[in-house]
Amino acid sequence: GEGFFAAVARKVSDGGSRVRVPKSRRTIFAPAGRRECAELARWVAEPGRMRFAAVADVYYAYYESQYEAVKMLAESLRVIASGVAMGQIFKERLKPDHALAMFCGLDRGAVPVAELSEEEALRFLRKQEAEAAAFAEGMNLVTHGGAALGFAKRIQNRVNNMYPNSLRIFNL
């Protein structure tokens, strides 16, 4: 889900070992610039409730109410995952991450929606060839029965399936 969760584990030792207080790390969140925010905001249904930040070269969305807490935790703890991975920005256009397709706050009007039949959806989830006629030119949100499956990009008569290799299905 999209709840706000934090977990900390402490190793129990046998003897009198010292308690190590983690040092504050440098900030890993770089606030998104004005241009980046404009591009990222068009992908979410309620951009006024979101804050956008870059971690390395990937942009993430955080709810405004949780951003400062997540930032503080990330500065002192090792964070495995946080926020909604929006994707990378190339030439002022977002290359969306799969997590964005799964985000319930995604604005479905940001890109054309390609509704697939069950057979076509299974082919998409297997990362097999897709019929270009089912997709609009450019980036598409791929759905089946109204549920988002991921993104695909049509370039002329070819479709680039952006479904992650690690999630594809092999037998069905």
List the predicted regions and their residue ranges:
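Short hydrophobic/aromatic beta-strand or adjacent loop that forms the aromatic wall/cage
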Residues: 2-7
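Polybasic, low-complexity RNA-engagement segments
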Residues: 12-172
